[in-house]
């Protein structure tokens, strides 16, 4: 007998992006969307089309780039939001509008200032309007976790009649315990029957998002909304990888249920989201944390070596992580072998990107004895970022900090111009680097976060630097990435990358403004 499928609705690009510091540009969102498609996600919530021109543009481009997953836009239960969602989804092969309105007493009274009957009327009108654009429409009861179940039944019956095919029950503030959420879903499942698919969207404020989601699946939910790495505002959302691997690992509990997720793509998806957002899972994070398959205890190590199942309930290879990080290529490896390795790692690159990445790889071979998969992933992530290079780092020179206040001299090449050289003194080498780049670009940035980590083990490991920089007050911080064996060079590259992203975003916003003024 074939298993009943649980739909995986990924909202990394919408709810996940609401995590502080996790903002992404359009090209980065497209890369994540294509990886989610490889992962086998059923529905990709690509954004909130009415929120900004940037969100609209990203959804539209993702809709063109992805064909195997349904592309979804969120919309409030108002016509202009729904129209924006429909327009942004026009290029999509498979598309869905996800509209919502709050249903809890506190939200209806204080936020909406509407009566329950007015809320039902608004919801029905929203579904009917969304259905005029496309067949697949989802409805969410915002703050359902604190809503009256009797009222939930009333509004769900009305939106089913209006044409909603999926009914989402969010625990918006992460308030409910598993048995409570399970009881709500069980009662609603018995009421709805096969008239629509029940969905859940659990937040992690009490650390229960995954537990609540799994309990709801057992109680009748057949779609679960989640994010890669549990990314999301406040304490985050239910983690996709934990839900999927729980269903896969506990066949004794979920035996008749399955997902379409290709679990071999879980690790690659986790790493991509972490690299782009700069938010890495904590080391002891289930499934994808770097300690998830590590055994330090001698007793545990002995048991695992004798028989893996003594202390491991799943294999690292199940999520696409090599159990031994193998040395993959060396200085004598050719372009063909490098291309095969890229394909094996799940990357799709253009001819130009392949050449650029291969050149970086050969240069790294001269600096490093052993090249690992993680080195190549890091190089590819940088070379496929598609951020316009308004400024390109040519070189840096740093003074000896022990001789007094350090200074940095930097050479940048501006697009279509000659090289520019300048220098500045700072409170440390990093500060001196950033001040010099600010002087050259004549744009002042304020550093909000700075992280450095080794890509692999060993003294000759590549340094990966992530910076978050605010170039304008009250605007989201821009993320920049830098990769080099020399940490200071990686730092300078990361800051220049953030600057280029900012300039690209500013140009895009300027074009959008001009278009709106013409209209």
UniProtKB/Swiss-Prot annotation:
Functional summary from the UniProt entry: Catalyzes the condensation of the acetyl group of acetyl-CoA with 3-methyl-2-oxobutanoate (2-ketoisovalerate) to form 3-carboxy-3-hydroxy-4-methylpentanoate (2-isopropylmalate).
Span of domain Pyruvate carboxyltransferase: 6-267
Record field: catalytic activity: 3-methyl-2-oxobutanoate + acetyl-CoA + H2O = (2S)-2-isopropylmalate + CoA + H(+)
Names of the cofactor(s): Mn(2+)
Family classification: Belongs to the alpha-IPM synthase/homocitrate synthase family. LeuA type 1 subfamily.
EC number(s) stated in the UniProt entry for this protein: 2.3.3.13
Region described as Regulatory domain: 392-519
Origin species: Wolinella succinogenes (strain ATCC 29543 / DSM 1740 / CCUG 13145 / JCM 31913 / LMG 7466 / NCTC 11488 / FDC 602W)
Subcellular localization, as worded in the UniProt entry: Cytoplasm
Listed GO biological process terms: L-leucine biosynthetic process
InterPro entries associated with the record: 2-IPM_HCS-like, 2-isopropylmalate_synth_dimer, AIPM/Hcit_synth_CS, Aldolase_TIM, LeuA/HCS_post-cat, LeuA_allosteric_dom_sf, LeuA_bact_synth, PYR_CT
GO cellular component terms given for this protein: cytoplasm
Protein name as annotated: 2-isopropylmalate synthase
Predominant location: cytoplasm
Keyword Metal-binding in record: yes
Entry annotated with the keyword Metal-binding: yes
Quaternary structure note: Homodimer.
